[in-house]
């Protein structure tokens, strides 16, 4: 398939730049893959849509305040986006500057902090830099980020981070710091909604996938089969695997809350021929899911509406069916559903209930 097969016109007015103050008040489009029926709801209706015994699987990653601002020694402003923390004093990062960044170059954070960052390695093929934090008056890089870092909201918001993002660009259940983007399907769940679901007999489990900045990057090759995914760190515990097996045994649905959960679960199942022998997984994955992929674990998917020509819409098209997802997206646009991280949600089920 061609990347252009996933191109559509997304009106700017449908891109939410700010979140709903009440998480579960967003709209919810429900698509039944077997009947191809589309229905319209609010996210707070989810308890009436799911069944007792269904299993919701969340990504428990948490966004780190990974964006830093500083200056070069020549006085030029720079922006540094931490991609991955390597140890207490080193990280891999993007550096955005009006000047070419050189090996060994020094940057200064803030105006009075006297914290220096040195470029100690350049990954040219990835446009990334390995940096070392010097004269740091903190225990480690993470404690520095927690003090002076900014929440790395998506570039399509076209604004700086604000106080509201520190709360609402995090899920209420996120516990493991490591992402520089939120698992946005989970942003719609508030504590009250989760408790309602639990009281109705709907089960909950977790995986961990730390999301990098490449989640915002478009696919730049003509044929999608030639696209190379970025590394993402994944953990799928044995207790989550056991919850999945019990759910399958009782004929309920395994529902992935977000594309990151899909990638984590399908990675864990990648090299197994039978669900009964799936084991826990911990490590990096480059799984790329696009139409033609055969899903091994996931029965249903909760996800936001994604950018054209992105790997995320390709994954959703693989799950819902390519022609189906074009029809669903057209319906969402016609009815003014909001798109992207702070937008509305959709629920795709592969079984008519």
Curated annotation (Swiss-Prot):
One of its GO terms (cellular component) is cytoplasm. Its main location: cytoplasm. Its EC number is 2.4.99.17. Keywords: Cytoplasm, Queuosine biosynthesis, S-adenosyl-L-methionine, Transferase. GO terms for molecular function: S-adenosylmethionine:tRNA ribosyltransferase-isomerase activity. Signal peptide: none annotated. The keyword Transcription regulation does not apply. GO terms for biological process: queuosine biosynthetic process; tRNA wobble guanine modification. It is found in: Cytoplasm. The keyword Nucleotide-binding does not apply. Coiled coil: none annotated. It catalyses: 7-aminomethyl-7-carbaguanosine(34) in tRNA + S-adenosyl-L-methionine = epoxyqueuosine(34) in tRNA + adenine + L-methionine + 2 H(+). Transfers and isomerizes the ribose moiety from AdoMet to the 7-aminomethyl group of 7-deazaguanine (preQ1-tRNA) to give epoxyqueuosine (oQ-tRNA). Monomer. Belongs to the QueA family. This is S-adenosylmethionine:tRNA ribosyltransferase-isomerase.
